[in-house]
Amino acid sequence: MKRFTAILLTGMMIFTLASCGKKAQDTPTEPETETQAVEKVEMPTETEAVTEVVTEAVKDTQQTEAQQEEQTAEQPDEEQNNSGENNSSYQYVERASYENGESVSLNPSWQYADHSAINSGCAVMYKATANRKNIVVGVNAGHGTSGGTSVKTLCHPDGSAKTTGGTTGAGATKAVAVSGGMSFNDGTPESSVTLRMAQILKDKLLAAGYDVLMVRDGSDVQLDNVARTVICNNAADCHIALHWDGDGLSYDKGCFYISVPGGIKGMEPVASHWQQHDALGASLIEGLRAHGAKINGNGSMAIDLTQTSYSTVPSVDVELGNACSDHSDATLENLADGLVQGVEGYF
């Protein structure tokens, strides 16, 4: 359209100049000969020439625009690409590459690695064998670090105080490296259930074509919350921490994710990633809802977490119930199906 407008304006200028030239010739100094008169009749006027040029330009422009429309229609919709790169809420991150079954330890050169206090353990990488999507999901079975409550780490990378309460109260600048977790009403430790949940989720993600970084692959891993987060930042495309809430209630209140509170949205790296964190959490809750899981309230609760404060990939803590919740394998299988659907919805 811009090309057509430029051509039309050029044609109008030529037309104007032609008109001016014609006026200058209206009073000839000598009478025309018969031959000159014939030539004048047979030759097209300058106005007719301009009209012909503009007409041809219009035809060329219309043909060009039609070709451009055909090319646009043939281009694939980038939002349908399943690699995750084109998701509007996902920013592709360069990550380290590991083989199937390879241990992934904390590299001291990684950003925020020096904030970790417990980091002698390793995560484990598992690769899908079919329909691989080239997406690594970090699965973090909450708790399960012996000695985790005996040391503390900074709540925020910049040393600022927590803005909301949780396991650690608002105003604190340090939190226990890894809390011990609660126990279900039947006495089962939360750390045992989160590990079983992680194992079931791992198998389902692998079957769906996702690679899985198992942050805790056994009953105990010597990685604190900062180390777990930093490893996921560098070896995974997202980080999902599995928990059940120790709220002390006498009924099962359902699932929810920990959203990012407003008080830390201006702090880096949260400022650059909080929308991704919340988008991932919301997608997981929708997946759980679709599989019939009970959802607490609107599905989210804003809490200032160490995990969120250090994350540079989409990261969320999902609470799958509380001490009153059923944690049989059948229930965990269903929850895992919902989480896989949520992962697929996000990517």
Question: How would you label these PLM feature ranges?
Answer:
Residues 1-8:
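Positively charged n-region of N-terminal signal peptides that target proteins for export
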Residues 4, 13-14, 21-347:
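Catalytic-site microenvironment of enzymes
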